[in-house]
């Protein structure tokens, strides 16, 4: 199975840089009019962009053994040996630029000059619309020469231009292209040079993205004019300002920072057509429900990590959430424009915006945000919608879908109601107009302790997963919303008898999804019956530090990037590759527990 090294910035994502070949298999970007993600792809046999170096007419990066590192834990860089040539390729999506750069450096180790060709070739085979499912676009792909960049323009039309991408280089480059009958376009960009003995040559290829020809070409030209060194320095400075170092643990440092930047650039992004910041599950089509919005995923998982690293970005996220997404708070999933994708009420998602807002204020002490009209209206909407789901006999609130998005067994879920308690209790402390919610929160806690606490055959109390207020309950847990987190939300102490009994039950070998006797002994559930990375994050947040350190040493996940679940023996990804919001929650939990 191929492994990938994703990278990206706010505007463009490179989800599939192939670790074996160095080829860029696709480029993705967010598009508001399409309600999701556009994916520009190569063919099965030829990537969209393949770096190559020819010595005496033979050789390429794809046939050499590539060794990989990441500058500042985010910018992929490969090194390889091709005969007497030492090759280095660096992939840089500069901060605040609508595009990316590929720097190719060749060092001649021989004692004589060498004629070398440094270039890129590839195939634009198809374009796709991605929101959960991937659907091919039916417009027309074109390629032509343009004076705007003195090179090629790749442009897509559906009655009018939808998007374009265009290359430029900082050295003299020859270009050619062929349009095939099947609609695919192949191309070649090449720089011919003679490298002296012990000499070095370098070429930077810039790729600009835009709505049409001029925007794409000038996006590339802007990076060219700024120069590669300036763009690289700016980007590395930005990354270094947000990196975290775990003293004496290089592996944990890399894991944290790579996942942090993956979260920042794959769970948020700026749309090409409207230039709005939006939040999504993942900007990688490799994730099985990509490019859509979930209140829970964005606000309970990715938001805490981004708030840790960049409070200003976190505030922008809240503006989007309480603006575009406000009217459908609590609905299963939505498109990036705020309209409903998958219907179904989820209680944890309804209060997720409150929890994120409270977290932001506690971190920054910026209470001015509470006077923002969108925030005021959003809080009012949540409180009104919450009342619609209140039980007739007590202060418990129902849900239709569980935190996995699967249908409930019983309507009153303990974890979800703890979130309601937490959100109202904290909101009551933020402003006088919400002080009355303190009493409501107390009544919710009383209802949880009265109705959600059950007893086993030996009379030991524990928290049931869900109840129906008619005496029925189930013993269960879900990593996306775990009972393990009750102390994290200050609902109870980690030493509380009821809590300890609950955790013992769901972690016992008798519990089907505990994986207690496996090397990766974290909790799963029927949605993905393997240990979840979210469960590992939950364990970090509830104090199982040494247990988690041991697992972090063993797991590979998705080539070092967080995924939904891993094999309980090998630690390799089993479901949910490129899970950007999960990457954020893993980072936040690592920072809370291990920094």
PLM feature spans:
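Long, well-ordered core segments of solenoidal/helical folds
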Residues: 259-271, 309-332, 374-395, 439-459, ...
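Extended ligand-binding clefts on enzyme/binding-domain cores
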Residues: 291-295, 381, 391-392, 410-419, ...
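The feature captures the catalytic groove of carbohydrate-active enzymes
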Residues: 202, 206-219, 287-288, 333-334, ...
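C-terminal catalytic domain of Rieske-type non-heme iron oxygenases
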Residues: 335-338, 519-523, 550-583
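Aromatic-rich carbohydrate-recognition surfaces in CAZymes
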Residues: 288-392, 417, 577-595
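Beta-strand-rich N-terminal accessory domains
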Residues: 1-56, 75
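Well-ordered alpha-helical scaffold segments within catalytic/enzyme domains
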Residues: 242-246, 262, 298-311, 352-369, ...
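Acidic/polar, glycine-enriched structural segments that form the non-catalytic walls/loops
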Residues: 86, 92-99, 103-291
């Amino acid at each position: 199975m191929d492994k990938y090294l994703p990278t990206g910035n706010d505007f463009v994502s490179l989800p599939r840089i192939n670790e074996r070949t160095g080829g860029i298999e696709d480029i993705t970007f967010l598009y508001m009019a399409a309600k999701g993600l556009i994916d520009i792809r190569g063919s099965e046999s030829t990537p969209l962009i393949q770096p190559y170096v020819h010595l005496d007419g033979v050789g390429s990066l794809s046939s050499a053994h590539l060794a990989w590192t990441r500058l500042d834990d985010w910018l992929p860089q490969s090194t390889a040996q091709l005969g007497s040539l030492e090759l280095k390729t660096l992939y840089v999506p500069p901060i605040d630029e609508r595009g990316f750069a590929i720097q190719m450096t060749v060092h001649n180790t021989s004692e004589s000059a060498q004629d070398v060709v440094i270039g890129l070739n590839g195939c634009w085979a198809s374009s796709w619309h991605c929101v959960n499912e991937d659907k091919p676009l039916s417009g027309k792909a074109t390629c032509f020469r343009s004076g705007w960049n003195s090179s090629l323009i790749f442009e897509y039309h559906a009655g009018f231009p939808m998007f374009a991408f265009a290359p430029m280089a900082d050295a003299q480059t020859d270009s050619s292209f062929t349009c095939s009958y099947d609609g695919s376009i192949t191309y070649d960009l090449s720089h011919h040079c003679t490298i002296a003995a012990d000499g070095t040559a370098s070429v930077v290829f810039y790729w600009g993205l835009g709505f049409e020809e001029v925007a794409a070409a000038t996006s590339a030209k802007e990076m060219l004019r700024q120069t590669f060194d300036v763009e690289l320095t700016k980007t590395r400075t930005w990354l270094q300002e947000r990196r975290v170092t775990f003293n004496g643990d290089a592996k944990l440092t890399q894991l944290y920072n790579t996942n942090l930047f993956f979260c920042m650039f794959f769970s948020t992004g700026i749309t090409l057509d409207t230039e709005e910041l939006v939040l999504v599950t993942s900007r990688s089509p490799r994730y099985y429900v990509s490019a859509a919005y979930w209140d829970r995923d964005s606000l309970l998982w990715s938001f805490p990590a981004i708030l840790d690293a960049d409070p200003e970005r976190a505030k922008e996220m809240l503006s989007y959430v309480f603006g575009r997404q406000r009217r459908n708070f609590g609905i299963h999933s939505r498109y990036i424009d705020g309209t409903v994708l998958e219907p179904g009420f989820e209680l944890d998602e309804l209060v997720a915006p409150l929890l994120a807002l409270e977290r932001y204020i506690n971190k920054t002490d910026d209470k001015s945000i509470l006077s923002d009209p969108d925030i005021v209206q959003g809080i009012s909407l949540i409180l009104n919608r919450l009342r619609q789901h209140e039980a007739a006999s007590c202060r418990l609130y129902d849900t239709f879908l569980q935190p996995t998005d699967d249908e409930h067994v019983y309507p009153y879920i303990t974890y979800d109601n703890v979130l309601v308690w937490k959100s109202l209790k904290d909101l009551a402390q933020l402003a006088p107009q919400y002080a009355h919610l303190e009493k409501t929160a107390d009544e919710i806690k009383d209802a949880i302790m009265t109705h959600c606490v059950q007893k086993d055959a030996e009379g030991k109390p524990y928290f049931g997963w869900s109840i129906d207020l008619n005496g029925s309950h189930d013993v269960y847990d879900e990593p996306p919303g775990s009972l393990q987190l009750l102390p994290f939300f200050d609902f109870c102490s980690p030493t509380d008898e009821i809590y300890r009994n609950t955790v013992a039950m769901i972690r016992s070998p008798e519990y089907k999804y505990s994986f207690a006797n496996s090397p990766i002994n974290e909790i799963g559930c029927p949605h993905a019956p393997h240990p979840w990375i979210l469960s590992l994050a939950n364990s970090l947040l509830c104090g199982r530090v040494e247990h988690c350190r041991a697992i972090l040493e063993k797991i590979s996940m998705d080539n070092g990037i967080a995924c939904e679940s891993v094999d309980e023996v090998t630690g390799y990804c089993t479901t949910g590759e490129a899970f950007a919001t999960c990457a954020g929650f893993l980072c936040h939990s690592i920072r809370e527990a291990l920094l």
